[in-house]
Each structure stands twice: as structure tokens, then as C-alpha cells.
Swiss-Prot record:
Keywords: Coiled coil, Cytoplasm, Intermediate filament
Matching Pfam families: Filament, LTD
LTD domain segment(s): 455-572
Region (Linker 12): 257-274
Ranges where the IF rod domain occurs: 69-422
Biased composition (Polar residues): 7-17
Source species: Caenorhabditis elegans
Keyword Transcription regulation: no
Region Coil 1B, annotated ranges: 119-256
Main location: cytoplasm
Source superkingdom: Eukaryota
Protein name: Intermediate filament protein ifa-1
Subunit and interaction comment: Forms some heteromeric filaments with ifb-1.
Similarity remark: Belongs to the intermediate filament family.
Amino acid sequence: MMEITRETMSFTSTTPSARAPLGGRTTGNVTSQDRMLKIVTEMRSGAGSGLSPFGQNAASTIRDSREREKKEMSDLNDRLASYIEKVRFLEAQNRKLAADLDALRSKWGKDTHNIRNMYEGELVDAQKLIDETNKQRKDMEGQLKKMQDELAEMRRKLEDATKGREQDRAKIDALLVTLSNLEAEISLLKRRIAQLEDEVKRIKQENQRLLSELQRARTDLDQETLNRIDYQNQVQTLLEEIDFLRRVHDNEIKELQTLASRDTTPENREFFKNELSSAIRDIREEYDQVNNVHRNDMESWYRLKVQEIQTQSARQNMEQGYAKEEVKRLRTQLSDLRGKLADLESRNSLLEKQIQELNYQLEDDQRSYEAALNDRDSQIRKMREECQALMVELQMLLDTKQTLDAEIAIYRKMLEGEENRAGLKQLVEQVVKTHAITQETDTETMRVVKGETASRQSFQRSAKGNVSIHEASPDGKFIVLQNTHRAKDEAIGEWKLKRRIDGKRENVYTLPRDFVLRAGKTLKIFARNQGVASPPDQLVYDAEDSFGSGNNVQTILFNKEGEERATHIQRQSTA
């Protein structure tokens, strides 16, 4: 009976990290007599090469297990007795592969238990990492929800501020309308006051004229009184003259009578007496007639003058009373208008003060509104960056979890497929390919593996204003600037972009004069020979072929005054 030996393979880890970085490419050779097993892994982002843990374990355990294989032969022969009927057709092949089977199956002993314990520990660590990741994810989701609530609160406050601003504007418009109405009313009152003052002036002139006419009438009255006295004197004189003439006539009559009496002839005496009587009667009638005419004329003229003076005086008194009443009324109205004007002026000053206070309040509200908008935009940018970082980190954790799940499944298949040794090489290659596939999805960090070392890159950026450094190539090929404002263009002409490498070397690029970065747009600046200039979206830094790369790279944007407006810090650490 032919003996068929069964050997076991064990894998142990001697690296500090207990697991090779995912996505690396390692090559290891395992040689046993005339059979060599080659394990190949791919490494997409590494910078060096080394033996994988499987190759190192295979090479180290083959030499140590040869003496032990001889002791385990008898035990393995007993265990493989049940397979004799199944492998009779492989007897010739078994003789040829006996040495290889002894070398390969010698690994499946206590080393398998060590591998199981090692990967069970890694599974526990991976489960803890998954739990911590889920916990962090829940915390981040809580923080995100809290930030969303704060954002909703800020939006509500912004809407309230906007409504208050609209109400203030409506109130200011109403006050302006009231002010314009009051100003129009004040202007109308001023015109009415001017008209009333003109009317008062005219009435004063009319009153002065009436006073002048009254004075003239009084003068005329005095003159007429003097004339009346003069006429009365003339009448008295005439009466006296008449009395004198009467006396003279009486004397003449007496003389004539005397003469007549001397005439002895009765006919003559009678004749002269009759003639004298007739003459006296005629004279008396003529005198009475003249006297009556003069008296009637004087009386009618006097009555007429007195009536005219009385009528004119009554009219002047009436007009003067009317003028006094009108002046009194106008003075009362003027006093009322002046009081109303004072009230309107005080109200106008109060309204102007209120308008000034509302303008100040409006300016404060506008400044608060702009500050709230800027704060909200900065918080939104910060939350977007944090969300992006959380999404990237979450994607990394999910990729790590998928990788660990794939490794666990493959190692479980390897442990369960202990009896079937034909697919060992395919399983190892599947593990390696899985590593390579999962490494390609890692976008946040880049691992460079050489032997047992790895490096990690991280970045941090900040901005004061709307212009930020959106992206900076780690190899220094390009830098991207972004205007985060949705409506405002930014003039960044003659701004300086400095890139400091490891605190030593520094490259400076000055943007063209009068360059404007449009709202919501980006500007990509290439190093020399790394891109084509296409303003305003692309520019070229002609001084260097690269902006520079290193372990600690700081990219800083300065304005024309030398103030720092945006930063982008890249760090690369080695573990």
C-alpha cells in the first residue's frame, strides 16, 4: 500500500502592523525541493516592494518544519488511510509529489491555530473599529442634524430680519408720505400766512387811507365850520347892514316925511306918502326876498354839508369797525396758524428724528443682515467641508469594512478548505486581488508602502472672505481658487499666491492686474508645462515646472495689501 502524507501550512505575522497595507504589491517565493509557490500582490499607490506575510511565513516555516515532518509522517499516514480508495489513480503522481506534499502539508499544524488566533484578534479589532465608526457616524449625524437645525434657525431669523426690514421700509415709506404731506401742508400754511400778511398789509394801507380821508374830512368839516361861522358872520353883518340901512331909510323916510309935512298941499303929502309907502314896501319885499333866498341857500347848503359829513363819518366809522374786526380776525387766525405751524414744525422735527433713528436702525439691520449672511455662508461652507470630510471618512471606513469582510470571508474559506489543497494558490491570488481592488476606492489618503512603512496625507484649508483655495495638487502641478459667493464677483488682481515647502523653499505667483474671479467660478493655475492658459478659467505659472511638494506644504493667498485671505495646508506623515 502506498503512503500518502498530508502536510499542514501555517501563516504567522512578523510585521508590526499585523497586516500588509491594502492595495500594495508584494512578491514572495516559497521553495520546497523542486516545487516553488509564487504569491503576487498588487500595490497601486506604494513606492517600494517587499515580501508579503504569506511568502515570509512560507519561507520561514519550511526550514523549521522539515524535522517535524518526519515525526508527523506516521500520524499523517494514519489520518490519510481513509483516502486510499479515492486516490489509487494518483499513486504514480503521489510518488512524484510526496516530497512537495510533505513540505506543504507540514504547515497545517499548530501554526494554523496561531493564524486563526491572529485573524480572530484582527476580526475583533475590525469589529471594534466598525462599532467605533458607527458610533462616530451616529455622532456626526447628530452633529449634522444639530447644524441643520441651527441652519434652519438661522434661516428663520434671517426671514424674520427680512420681514422686519420690509416692515421698517413700509413704516419709513408711510412716515415719508406723512412727512411730505406735512411739508405740503406747512408750505400751504406758509403761503396762506403770506397771503394773510399781504391782506393785513393791504387792510392797513386801506385803514391808513381811510384815516387820511377821515382826517381830510375832519379838515373839510373844520373848514366848513369856519365857512359856516364866516357865513354866519356875513349874515350877521348883512343883518346889521340891513338894520343900518333900515335905520338910514327910516331916517330918510322921516326926513322925507318931514319934508312932506312941510308941503302944505294935501295932495302932495298924500302922493309922497303913498310913494314912500310903496317904495318902502318894495324895498322891504325885495330885502325879505333876498334875505329869504340867502337864508334858504345857507340852510340847504349847511344841511347838505352836515348830512354829507355825517354820512361820510358814519361810513368811515363803519369801515373802520369792519377793518378793526377784520384785523382782529386776521390776528386771531394768524395766531392760530402760528401755533399750528409751531406744532407742525415740532411734529416735523420729531418725524425727522424718527426717520433718522429708523435709518440708523435700518443700517444696523443691514449690517447685521450682511453679517448674518456672511456667517451663514461661512457656516454652510464649513458644514459642507465637514460633511465632505465625514463622507470621505465614512467611505474610507466602509471600504475598510468591505475589505475586512472580504478578507474574513477568504480566510474563513482557507480555514474551511483545509482538506482541499488544490485551490490554495487561487485563494491567495484572490486575497491579493481583493486588496488591490479595495485600495483603488480610497480617495482621501494615499499609502506608500516599502517593507513595513506607510504614509498618510491630510489637508486643512480656511478662508477669510469669498475667495478660497479649493484644491492644491500634492505634486505641485496646479492650484485651484474658488469664489464661493453666488452673486458677487471678486477683484483679485495683483493678489499673491505663496507656496511654502517644509518651511524652507517658497514659490510666489502674482495674479494679473485687473483680474476678476466671477461669482461661483473657479480659477485653475497650472505650473509650467502642466497645462494651457485659457483666461479667465486657467492660468499658467511660468517661473517653475512645479509649485513644489513635500511633507509639510503651506499654500497661502494674500491680497494687494499683504493681508492673508486663504490658506491650504498639506501634511504627510509616515508610520
